[in-house]
Every structure is written in C-alpha cells, then in structure tokens.
Amino acid sequence: MTTQQETLTDGNALKQFVVLAKSSKGRAIVSIIEKALNHPSVFVFGELLDMPNVQQLKETEFKNYYDLLLIFAYGSFIDYKNKKDSLPQLTPQMITKLKQLTIVFLSSTSNVIPYSVLQEQIEITNVRELEDLIIDSIYQNIIKGKLDQKNKHLEIDFSIGRDVQPEQLDSMINCLNNWSSTSQKLLDDISGLITHSDKVHLQYRKEKEEFESKFEIAKLNTKNDSPAEQLYYDSMEYSDEVRMKKGPKIKGKDYNKRP
C-alpha cells in the first residue's frame, strides 16, 4: 500500500500539500506545514499559504506556524532569528532550507555576493561550511553559479523564483511595462534598419540595371562608330572581364596568383 509520504514526489509535492490542506484544520494543518517546510523539494509556499484553512491559523493558537510559513515564503534567515522567540523551533532540514532561500533572496539584489555578506545573513562563520552549503544548493538546482575562492565571493548565474508578496505586484508590473517599452523601441529600431537596408539594396539594383542597360545600348551603337571608337568600347569590356578573373588586389598583391 502506498503511504502518504511516498506520494509526495518531487513533481507533485506542493500540489499534494495544497490538496491535503483543503480538508484539514487546526493541528492537521500545522502538520502539513511542518511536512512542507521539511520536504527537500519544496521551495515555494505561496499556494499553500493562500489556502483558506491555512489563513484561518492567524486567528488560532497556531498563528506562530502561519508566521513561520510566511517567513519561508517571503523572508530570510535573519527574519526568523529576529522573531525566534515567538516562532516554532526549526528542524535541521528547515534551517538548511531557510539558509538556501536566503541565498536566493540575496541573489535577487546582486549577482555577486561576498562571502562576508553570506556569512552575516545566514550566520555561518566557517568558510568551508558556507561553501558546502552553496555547493549543495547548486547540486539541487536552487542556484547556478560558481565560487570565487580567491576573491571570496559567489557569482550567481541563475536562482529559482520565490513567492511574490501582494504589495510587490505593482513594482513588478512597472518593471515589466518598462521592459516591454524598451523591447518595443529596440524592435522599432531594428525594423528601421531593415527597411533602410532594403531601400539601399533596391537602389543599388536599380543603378546596376540602369548601368548595364546603358552599357548594352552603347555597345550596340558602336556598330555605327568609327573603328577607333569601337576598339575603345571593346577594350573597356575586356578590361572588366580581366578584373573579374583576377579578383581584387590589395597593396599590389594578387590574391588569385598561386605562390
């Protein structure tokens, strides 16, 4: 028989917690929150946090578990430390996860994070322990980046997304609107360059066709010209053919000539 724990796989862990929260209340909700915070693959909690039965914890004796879930969704390790006395005690798994989420939080402000900042924010004094935590986070695909041990900083290339607080939505919308405006301007500039390039190409073709037409007319007219004039036009055509065969010369060098 499949147990509840076995069904909480990497792909559906959060979804399963959300489903369980729909029909649970009080202490049962607390148990679901604890399991979600301890689960090695769950790093976003907004959907669980928004569940009505979870929201109801704010009015009960279990409010501290709601506050704890709030920190894991939006906060950092320092936030927990500042409210530690009024919050449930963290398990070792929760401590590690919250420290990893703190690294993700810091990566949203800078893609180069000094060791000193990391050590202060997640309260790790030992550099080797800090690097082990970072390496574990990279292996878990929480972040992507590299350690610069010489300069003692972490270079971030990628980090997972975290939950967004409602009050952050307006700021995000403004950022997206600015990005959209910049992208549209860039697209308009590129379209303008393409249009200009097409015009130049068409003008070149037109001039080339006009020249070839005039040249053919001139050749036909040579039939009625004197022998000297006909020799002149023939020599012009011959010179063009020779130049085409020989190719370009730069600084007196013939690049079609074999060594």
UniProtKB/Swiss-Prot annotation:
Subcellular location: Cytoplasm; Nucleus
Main location class: cytoplasm
GO cellular component: COP9 signalosome; cytoplasm
InterPro entries hit by this protein: COPS7/eIF3m, PCI_dom
S-S bonds: none
Domain PCI per the UniProt entry, residue ranges: 1-161
UniProt keyword Nucleotidyltransferase, yes or no: no
Entry keywords, A to Z: Cytoplasm, Nucleus, Signalosome
UniProt-listed SMART domains: PINT (SM00088)
Subunit (UniProt): Component of the CSN complex. The holocomplex is comprised of 8 subunits csn1-8. In the complex, it probably interacts directly with csn2, csn5, csn6 and csn8.
Role description: Component of the COP9 signalosome complex (CSN), a complex involved in various cellular and developmental processes. The CSN complex is an essential regulator of the ubiquitin (Ubl) conjugation pathway by mediating the deneddylation of the cullin subunits of E3 ligase complexes, leading to modify the Ubl ligase activity.
PANTHER family according to UniProt: COP9 SIGNALOSOME COMPLEX SUBUNIT 7, COP9 SIGNALOSOME COMPLEX SUBUNIT 7/DENDRITIC CELL PROTEIN GA17
Protein family: Belongs to the CSN7/EIF3M family. CSN7 subfamily.
Protein name: COP9 signalosome complex subunit 7
